[in-house]
Design a protein with these regions (language model features):
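Contiguous, glycine/small-aliphatic-enriched amphipathic segments in soluble metabolic enzymes
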Residues: 1-139, 182-266, 270-284, 290-295, ...
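Glycine/threonine-rich beta-strand-loop-alpha-helix active-site module
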Residues: 131-153
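Short, flexible loop segments at boundaries between secondary-structure elements
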Residues: 145-161, 288-304
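Ligand-binding beta-strand-loop-alpha-helix segment within the catalytic cores
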Residues: 156-186
Length: 317
């Protein structure tokens, strides 16, 4: 391993927009002429070369067998495809899912071997993963399993707005049932540590409420009184600066204006709607609690526009 860093790029499902946005994002770095690291793309070689020919024909890339043989900066790719992969643009299929899954498996192995220093992921299709009978259907779950990391944390970054997710891909009913004082306290302690690692000496956290108007004293539910307020009180006694529950219709606005350093979102859509409404294209997702930092786009495979040159690549960049 040299002093140079190597970042693994996982374009995601090859039937979707992942290959297009990965190539477009890498093209910008290549055109700037100052690559900050070696970017190692784990992809179906034929489809990656096709994407390069369509969207970045002048971009210089090289094929590598392993990231360990790469010295210096540049754009490289490692072939994870099979020659007989029957992958059609815009079509959800088990073949495409298996190709994306092989890329994840190979990249995580290289991380474990110390050859990759960070991961950037494009979108995969959860329905395709089910068709392929792959156990974990999301990147976060797959990476957590591969690295034996039991408690990965999802952080959304949208300009100056930061959102931590207490739950992710659960139904709303499951997310509500998962509200628990002890678990919220543990979650608050963990994200406080992560915020300090990100450079916030005394992070000021906001807790999003579950019910309208934070239940208005119990008029619209009792989760705030039973669970959220006791958890916030416990965290403050531990020296963590966190608010009482604040209505979700205002807490994200307040954080975007700098009143809070980060917001605790209780369920998937609560934070996703806020971030994507604020700036859909520039929202990125980071997964903390893994051996390396993983960043990701905040959108899906967009099969309806796949391989048509229409996809925005800002989030991937």
């Amino acid at each position: 391993m040299t002093g140079r860093r190597r970042f693994g790029v996982l374009p995601g499902d090859p039937a979707g927009i992942g290959y297009e946005i990965a190539v477009k994002a890498l093209r910008e770095y290549d055109e700037a002429g100052a690559l900050p690291a070696a970017f190692v793309v784990y992809a179906h070689a034929g489809l990656f070369e096709l994407a390069r020919a369509r969207y970045a024909p002048k971009m210089q890339i090289a094929r590598a067998r392993t990231p360990g043989e790469i010295d210096g900066t540049g754009i490289y790719y490692i072939d994870v495809g099979y020659g007989d992969d029957d992958i059609a643009p815009g079509v959800v299929s088990a073949q495409a899912a298996r190709c994306a899954h092989r890329a994840i498996e190979r990249c995580t192995l290289d991380v474990t071997n110390g050859d990759i220093d960070g991961i950037c992921t494009g979108p995969i299709h959860k329905g395709a993963m089910r068709l392929a009978n792959i156990g974990e259907i999301g990147h976060t779950e797959m990476l957590a399993h591969a690295f034996d990391a039991p408690n990965p944390i999802t952080l959304f970054l949208t300009n100056d707005l930061r959102i931590f997710f207490y739950t992710r891909h659960w139904s709303l009913r499951q997310a509500i049932d998962a509200l628990d004082v002890e678990q919220l306290v543990a979650f608050g302690e963990t994200i406080n540590v992560h915020m300090r690692q990100l450079g916030f000496a005394s992070p000021h956290l906001a807790l999003a409420a579950l019910n309208p108007h934070a239940s208005d004293g119990g008029q619209f539910g009792d989760e705030e009184e039973r669970i959220l307020v006791p958890a916030a009180n416990r965290l403050r006694r531990l020296g963590i600066d966190i608010s009482d529950p604040i209505g979700a219709d205002s807490v994200f606005y307040l954080a975007s204006r700098g009143k809070y350093d980060a917001v605790v979102s209780l369920y998937h859509d609560q934070g996703h709607i806020a971030a994507k409404t604020y700036d859909f294209d520039r929202t990125i997702s980071a997964t903390l609690g893994l051996p390396v930092l993983r960043t990701s786009v905040d959108h899906g495979t967009a099969m309806d526009i796949a391989w048509r040159g229409m996809a925005q690549h800002v989030s991937m960049k």
